[in-house]
Curated annotation (Swiss-Prot):
It comes from the Bacteria. Changing residue 38 to A: Still fully activated as a holdase by HOCl. Pfam families: Thioredoxin, TPR_19, TPR_20. One of its GO terms (cellular component) is cytosol. Contains an N-terminal mobile Trx domain and four atypical tetratricopeptide repeat (TPR) motifs in the C-terminal region. The Trx domain lacks the canonical Cys-x-x-Cys active site of thioredoxins and is not a functional oxidoreductase. GO terms for molecular function: unfolded protein binding. The gene is cnoX. InterPro entries: Thioredoxin-like_sf (IPR036249), Thioredoxin_domain (IPR013766), TPR-like_helical_dom_sf (IPR011990). This is Chaperedoxin. The keyword Chaperone applies. It comes from Escherichia coli (strain K12).
Length: 284
């Protein structure tokens, strides 16, 4: 099987692979074609190496061809598997094992899915690519049962995207022990965003809408302004109030704006999901 993170060990690459374990866990697999157990274990290990996609290196050592190296490890049985991390063996087993047991062994040292997603998101945040970081952090936050540290990253990203309402909702879930100076800084940023979001244009449109509550075109203008400053729930509620009465309000512009805001929020957004369901109920 040809996978980049599967290597066949020999005298020339043994030291290099051991050094690689300083940064990436290495699963050393000592096998022999004479062993029936290896016939069962080899495809399991190779399949896991492919599934984990570079999170660990599978280092295979043919004990018949590389007897000198095998002797250095003082093997007592074949197959034997050692898990190396930071240049040292940290776990292992002898004989056949089910896939679940091997996964459990790997999961002790490999980062969890939410950690990987958070790491990817942090890299994107460093590049100021908050749009692509957002879905990764949403997933990571849910996978981690709303971990406080990931929650702060999510709130920071939402603030950068001018979505103060959503950021505030996330910060409300942060446990007391995680409400440090960074948390306080994010709260302060949200307050500044809120102040900036109450623009004179919005205030004027709000007054006009209050005076002309049946004017869907005016309400659509206001909703667009609210969306642009991150006040999405207010915008959607305003638009939906008119759609509830007339799906073709403002010559269809109200529904078009409503759907554009939903699209901008993304498929995984809770607020967007809520209003998509409400629109669907109106349509069908």
């Amino acid at each position: 099987m040809s996978v980049e993170n599967i290597v066949n060990i020999n005298e020339s690459n043994l030291q290099q692979v051991l050094e690689q374990s300083m940064t990436t866990p290495v699963l050393f697999y000592f096998w022999s074609e004479r062993s029936q157990h290896c016939l069962q274990l080899t495809p399991i290990l190779e399949s896991l190496a492919a599934q984990y996609n570079g999170q660990f290196i599978l280092a295979k050592l043919d004990c018949d061809a590389e007897q000198m190296i095998a002797a250095q490890f003082g093997l007592r049985a074949i197959p034997t598997v050692y898990l190396f991390q930071n240049g040292q063996p940290v776990d292992g087993f002898q004989g056949p094992q089910p896939e679940e047991a091997i996964r459990a062994l790997l999961d002790k040292v490999l980062p969890r899915e939410e950690e990987l997603k958070a790491q990817q998101a942090m890299q994107l945040m460093q590049e100021s690519n908050y749009t692509d970081a957002l879905p990764l952090l949403k997933d990571a936050w849910q996978l981690s049962n709303q971990n406080g540290e990931i929650g702060l990253l999510l709130a920071e990203t939402l603030i950068a995207l001018n979505r103060s309402e959503d950021a505030e909702a996330v910060l409300k879930t942060i446990p007391l022990q995680d409400q440090d100076t960074r948390y306080q800084g994010l709260v302060a940023q949200i307050e500044l965003l809120k102040q900036a979001a109450d623009t004179p244009e919005i205030q004027q449109l709000q007054q006009q809408v209050a005076e002309n509550p049946e004017d869907a075109a005016l309400a659509t203008q206001l909703a667009l302004q609210l969306h642009q400053v991150g006040r999405n729930e207010e915008a959607l509620e305003l638009l939906f109030g008119h759609l509830r009465k007339d799906l073709t309000a403002a010559d269809g512009q109200t529904r078009k704006t409503f759907q554009e805001i939903l699209a901008a929020l993304g498929t995984g957004d809770a607020l967007a999901s809520k209003y998509r369901r409400q629109l669907y109920a109106l349509l069908y």
